[in-house]
Amino acid sequence: MTDYLLLLVGTVLVNNFVLVKFLGLCPFMGVSKKLETAMGMGLATTFVLTLASVCAWAVNQFILVPLGLAYLRTLTFILVIAVVVQFTELAVRKTSPMLYRLLGIFLPLITTNCAVLGVALLNVNQSHNFLQSAVYGFSAAVGFSLVMVLFAAIRERLALADVPAPFRGASIALITAGLMSLAFMGFSGLVKF
């Protein structure tokens, strides 16, 4: 149990996918202008990333490795992620039309989020078992969502601030992301891998 807790804390804070591994930067910069959209993207990513992580692990363990097709991992994982996103979109549309309208634009964007593919590939490279893959996928998504919501809240405050003209827009956003990355480096001694 302690190993799973360390994996959770380590992935969310110490080895954050956005601020440490630099995966998922496109949605991080593009969808984080408003807090509501960041929360919607974070919620959708959490569900999809956890499910895709488990499905990719199962496909790797039960299909690719036994058949000696490990060289097809990346292509197969991309297909698995696309299927999971489509399945999620259909399930959400059927069960909760209100949630579908809220998350509708974000679900197709998750297919192109490199963090989802990164989690699937890192699960294989780190030889995680089923439960570790689920925890790793969930904690990567929680870390992604946490950073995205924090960044969106900061960007909303910056929109109201008196920022010098040369730093407005993408410049101040990148400076803020760098400062957040430095802040998260403070967690580096929290968990030793």
From Swiss-Prot:
GO cellular component: plasma membrane
One of the GO biological process terms: electron transport chain
Subcellular location: Cell inner membrane
Origin: domain of life: Bacteria
Keywords: Cell inner membrane, Cell membrane, Electron transport, Membrane, Translocase, Transmembrane, Transmembrane helix, Transport
Family affiliation: Belongs to the NqrDE/RnfAE family.
Protein name: Ion-translocating oxidoreductase complex subunit A
Organism of this sequence: Edwardsiella ictaluri (strain 93-146)
Organism lineage: Bacteria, Pseudomonadati, Pseudomonadota, Gammaproteobacteria, Enterobacterales
